[in-house]
């Protein structure tokens, strides 16, 4: 939200100044898209002071703000939510690393992120574009549907072939052919999906 820089000369404190961090242009739109994709709640975890965090959160329509947090505090908040839900965490700093490791899914910024955050995250946004997360959510949903289709289809066909084989209605070579066929159907099903 902002960066504080302290100035000293010859071991004497001369003052400090703050540089405001601006949110990325796509952040508000990104948060709205997340809601459309089933993400229930967005929560800000920041080490910055509460007043500034609240202003920032209002601009972005963030549901909940937790400010003035140390890395261990961020981890505690994340673990509280993780008891009842899956959590996804997006961060860029070294202070975000503990939460990134603990989260069910985490993203770091590749260009602006610290090395520790990049190492701790599950995914790295190479160009720091948050819309990459939306694409990841879309791909993971398609993948989940595909996996379920393949599992259910494979089990169903194998059970049918097993029953037919048990009653002698299908020869051994037919069962082997059906088994290979199930594998081919699963592969073809996977190939039909365009990501």
Report each predicted region and the residues it spans.
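Membrane-embedded transport module
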Residues: 121, 126-195
